Each structure stands twice: as structure tokens, then as C-alpha cells.
């Protein structure tokens, strides 16, 4: 309602100003005389010389008041004339309203004339004065309105509603599946928020800030909410981007207001998501944006030094780019504790899937451990998306329960996108795609350190004509040279199969080459797994030597892949033929095919 009234006032003001200007424009347009303006004496001279070719028009142009005699009203007479040369002139004569103009010159010179007398109108004069007053007043009101609007918007920039982010967290650690070590690290923070005196007595200083670092979707925000929920304290959630504006000083002001509010509601948890936006390294160019960012970070550093541990404020920052943070933000006394939130392992993935499946109707054949095996490297958010997609597919298929069929399709949709069944290959293209995917599968089956095949399909998804779902035999903390070489060979398997069977190659392997080259480059420049030794890539490195070493790794892997493919040509043909028959092959069908091939 408040905004409606403001809008009505604004629109009314605009209309009044428009009408006032319109009236003035019409008045000028109607009464403005034509031609050049001349003096009264010049006009009389032209009449005397009989230079006038048309009739002369006399009219009251406007009414005026004398400054020294307010009640002495004068009419301004307008006289328009046209000469023999078709030149137009006009003149104005001021006379008292009671006086009469002398028209003796015109009849004497046999010039016809018209005289229009408009008597003085108090109503018209008052209306004219009132309209001019309204014009000035409305212009003033409009100016004030614009000024207040700018001031109000400036105030909004300066006090963006960060305080409204205060909430009571309904999450606890029971709502966070996996992340066992991370939850253990944060448990003592709960005790501090509940009983800070216990730590003060011993002289222990609880961390002022906790930095949660990890890939997107691993549950950093959820951990912060669960911490506040377990401790039953207010939870403030803001994003780092909310502090950064183009106007210098705005971000720093927001930081001050946020910490002021947090101190009034201590103990509490203050969560800053994407803190790398706010806390990135200072320096660089001296543009306005950089100055604003630096001032905001300086204010954050000051605020984190400005409250004592006894106030019970724990600042939690979340980022997936900790390497971008300013060193001053990471020193002891600010973000004292750093917790790495990794992607879930197979056990954690199974727990996450079970947690997100609690409110869903599932069939009895659901195997969460098997599904967890098929989802290596997936985050908690992606796993939640898989179950949600499965629920949607169940409704679409008019089923009452979610089955493994829907879960398998949902996994494909999350990883590769929806199936493009409308795309129809010609027989030769379809056969090439089948052999390409079969080539990847053969390497996964026959190479010792390669990832094992879970499913193969030639149904197009996203930009891929088909794909292999492969996973490592066991999850490891790091990768070895043999595993990395085997992975390169797996990527090259599709191209090798095309070359052997068709004596031709397609563009379908472009992403395979990109992935293989990426691994080879890391082996050379980062992991020291080439003939160049352990030297790191830098601006002083010999780029030609690096490229040569990468090419050598790729060429050797290609040769070994080709040799392995020739040895297992029968298995390659059988997998390709089965793919052409049913488009998708499961892990069980692949294992049975391998057994039959050995017989």
C-alpha cells in the first residue's frame, strides 16, 4: 500500500508538469505572432509609407501588471502586418485597458484592418498565475522526489538486508550423512557455544573462524547449519558477493552492520558462503572495484580481531578456492581451523542415498551399495539430484515405487543429460558408435589397472553418441603411474577400435583425446612421471620438450592399446554386436559375455 501511494504521487506530479508545459506550449503556439519583431515607431513608419499589402490585425496578446503599480492593469496589443514583398512583421503596444488605440493612420492610408479586443479577465489571469505556481511547485516536488529516491536507493545499497538472513537452523548432524571426520571436528564448537565458561576456565581459546574447503555440493553449508542447529543458536547466512558493490565503502559498511547484529545476538554462527569473493588476495590494479574489495576485506579482518572469544561468535567461511584467499585471513586468530570437506567415499555415498530416500517410496530391490559403487566422484548434491530425478521418472512412468530402472536412468541423466532417442543414426554411423564404445569397454575389461565397465550404451546423451560408465576397482587417495597410463589407454580405445574395424576414424573421439592429453600433461608437468624427471612446469620451462614428452606418452599408450585390441578382436565384435541389438549392456551382461568368450 505504501509503494502504491508513492507511485500515485509520482505519476500525479509527472502529469501536472506535463499539463503545465503543454499549456505553455499551446499558449505560445496559438498567440505567438508570425514574422520579425519590430518597434512601434517602425511599424507606424511602414503604415505611413503604405508598404502594407494586407489588412492589419490588432488583438490583445496578453495582460500584464506594472511593477510599481500592482493594480494598474495593461493590455499588450499585438499588431501583425505583411508588406508588398510578402514580408511579415509584428509589433507590440502596451496600453491601459481603459484607453483606446488610435486607428487614424490605417483609414487615412486606405488600409483595411481588424480589431479584436479581449477584455481583461480576472479568472484567466488568476488561472495563469496559479498554473505557473503549480508548474514551479510540481517541478520542486519532482526534484525533491528524485533526490529522496536516490538517497533511499543509496541507503539500500549501504544496508542491504543482510540482517534478515538471521534464522533458526532446523538441521542437526543427524541430517548430514557421511562427513564423519568433519562432524567430529565441529563437535567441540557446539560445546563451546553451549558452555563457553568451561573453556575459559582452563584458558582454552576456541577458534574464532572455521574455514570449510571442498568441491561444490559436498555439504559445507549443511554442516554450518547443523552446527547452529545442534547448539540451538541463531544462524546468519550470507554470500560473499553480497558485500561487494561498485561503490567504495558500501561493502565495509555491510560488514560492520552484520557483525554488530551478530554481537547483539551472541552466541551465534555467522556463515559466509563463497568467501573467496570477499576475501581474495589484496593488490592488483587500483580501480574502484579493487579498492572497494580491499576495503571490505580490511573491515572483515578488523571485525574478526574486534570481538573476543567469550562473545560466542563463530565465523564459518566456505569456499572451493582456498588458494585465492588473502594470507591475512588465514592466519591464527582469524580462521584458525581449516576443515577439508572431500567428496564422499563409497560408504558415505550409500549413507547419503539412504538419507535422501527416507521420504520416497522405494521398491524392495533397491541396492544402495550397488548404486554407491556406480557413483564414484559424485557429490552429495549430485546424489540427491539422482534420487529426485528417479522420483520424477517414476511419476512419468505411472509407477507407485522407485525401482533400479528409474535410478539407473536418473544416474545417466545427471551424468550425461537426457537421452536423445529422436536422433536416428544411419546403419553405418550406428555401427561405428557401437564399435567405438566397445573399444573403450575392451580396455576396461582386459587391462589390469583400468577402470571397470559398469554399463555401455549407444543411446545419444548430451554431446555424446554413447558412453561407458566405468569406475575404479577400489577408491584410492591418490593415483599411480600405471593407473594413469591405463586411464589414457581407456580413452584411446574408441579411436583404436574405429581404425581397426573401419580403416577410418571419426570426430567422436575428440573429448577422449582431450582427457587423455590432460592426464599426460599432468604426468609430465606436475607429477614428474616422464623422461623429463621431476621438474615442474613454469614460465622458464622448455615448452617444446614438454610437448614432446606428452606426445611420447600418448603415442606409446596408443600403440599398446592397438596391440591389446588386436588380441581381443573377438570380444570387441561380440560387445559391438550386442550393443547393436539392445543399445544398452549392463555389468552382468558384460561379465557373462566375457565368460562365453573364454569358452
From Swiss-Prot:
Name of the top EC class for this enzyme: hydrolase
GO molecular function list: ATP binding; ATP hydrolysis activity; ATP-dependent peptidase activity; metalloendopeptidase activity; zinc ion binding
Free-text cofactor note: Binds 1 zinc ion per subunit.
Binding site for ATP: 214-221
Function: Acts as a processive, ATP-dependent zinc metallopeptidase for both cytoplasmic and membrane proteins. Plays a role in the quality control of integral membrane proteins.
Official protein name in the record: ATP-dependent zinc metalloprotease FtsH 3
Protein EC: 3.4.24.-
Primary subcellular site in the record, as a coarse category: membrane
Species the sequence originates in: Phytoplasma mali (strain AT)
Transmembrane regions listed in the UniProt entry: 8-28, 129-149
Highest taxon listed in the record's lineage: Bacteria
Subunit-structure text: Homohexamer.
Cofactor needs: Zn(2+)
Family under the similarity heading: In the central section; belongs to the AAA ATPase family. In the C-terminal section; belongs to the peptidase M41 family.
Membrane topology (UniProt): Multi-pass membrane protein
Cellular localisation: Cell membrane
CDD domains: RecA-like_FtsH
Residues the record lists as binding Zn(2+): 436, 440, 512
GO cellular component: plasma membrane
Any single biological process term in GO: proteolysis
Cytoplasmic side: 1-7, 150-599
Active site (catalytic residues): 437
Pfam families: AAA, AAA_lid_3, Peptidase_M41
PROSITE patterns per the UniProt record, alphabetical: AAA (PS00674)
